[in-house]
Amino acid sequence: MKNRELTNKEVIEIQLNYPHGTRIVLNHMEDKWAVPPGTRGTVEHVDDAGQIHPKWDNGRTLAIVPQVDSFRELTEQEL
């Protein structure tokens, strides 16, 4: 998927859907130094561009670009 600038409405929606403390798991990341698929993390914040900044369980801090990368929130059973 092509990276495009998000609207303010889209950024606010991401911020509301992924507040600080949300647990996520990465499916795929489009980056030369990508975090490995299956890595879990905790959302620290969503920036003004709509990028999600998790603290990955493996110690990495690379941001997710929602319109390019694939991830999901962990279910209650997975926590």
What is each residue range found by the language model?
Residues 2-79:
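Basic/aromatic-rich interaction segments and small domains that mediate binding to polyanionic partners
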